[in-house]
A protein has these predicted regions:
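Compositionally biased, proline/threonine/alanine/serine-rich low-complexity intrinsically disordered stretches
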Residues: 5, 227-228
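Alpha-helical cap/lid subdomain in secreted, periplasmic
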Residues: 56-67, 80-227
Length: 228
């Protein structure tokens, strides 16, 4: 793992038991992951597809779990939560994945005046995914000048954090990761964000993909202990 990524690993979020994934890993079965999101997931053309965090995640998760991982990239640049929810059936449920990684929220913050409606749709979509027995990883907003100065950013972040605290849902703290890397002096904003002031650089994608794979792998290997 890239050393600058590893030094910020403590802030990316907790692990949780994911029984359905644990069973597949224990049997050595392949795992199908849908990466669902906007341009952070799809890529922007400024970086090769192989360097986008979703691609890094697929490679690294296979190494971590020692089992094949099929990564289906369903990112679409510019999408808000309502637009993603509109394609949830086609792009997620119809793929019959074992895990959904949902990167979300940034376009709602940047394009909307108030994000309460988007948050309500996020909650409903998560309920739909849970009803299908799918574990979900929520990837929150990035650190970037355009994002940091928007008044709706803290509102969206808080909503994602609240949903990510529920059973069967992981929260990958991308914003905390990037902020820790900058505040520690390991990197600068310019190292992690492209010149457009919004999208992640190669290093931002690399750290997100590597540490996300580690979080998912640890959760997949956890065994839920029942208490009586």
């Amino acid at each position: 793992m890239e050393s600058r990524c590893a030094k910020a690993a403590s802030v990316v979020g907790d692990t949780k038991s994911l029984p359905s994934l644990h069973a597949k890993v224990a049997e050595g079965e392949s795992i199908k992951v849908v990466a669902f999101g906007s341009s952070s997931t799809e890529g922007t053309g400024q970086l090769p597809k192989s360097e986008i965090f979703a691609s890094v995640l697929g490679r690294e998760l296979s190494k971590e779990l020692l089992t094949p991982v099929e990564l289906i990239n369903k990112g679409k640049g510019g999408d808000t939560i309502p637009k993603m929810v509109a394609r949830l059936e086609r792009d997620v449920l119809a793929q019959k994945p074992d895990l959904v990684v949902w990167q979300l929220g940034v376009n709602d913050v940047l394009q909307m005046e108030g994000v309460e409606g988007a948050i309500s749709q996020m909650k409903a979509a998560i309920e739909t995914l849970r009803a299908h027995g799918l574990p979900v990883v929520l990837v929150d907003l990035q650190v970037a000048p355009m994002v940091d100065r928007d008044k709706d950013t803290p509102v969206m972040q808080a909503a994602i954090e609240k949903e990510g605290a529920r059973p069967g849902i992981l929260h990958f703290h991308r914003q905390a990761l990037m902020r820790r890397m900058i505040e520690s002096g390991e990197t600068t904003m310019d190292d992690l964000v492209l010149k457009d002031g919004l999208h992640m650089s190669r290093l931002g994608h690399l750290c997100t993909g590597q540490l996300l794979a580690q979080q998912i792998a640890k959760s997949s290997l956890e065994v839920k202990v029942s208490t009586r």
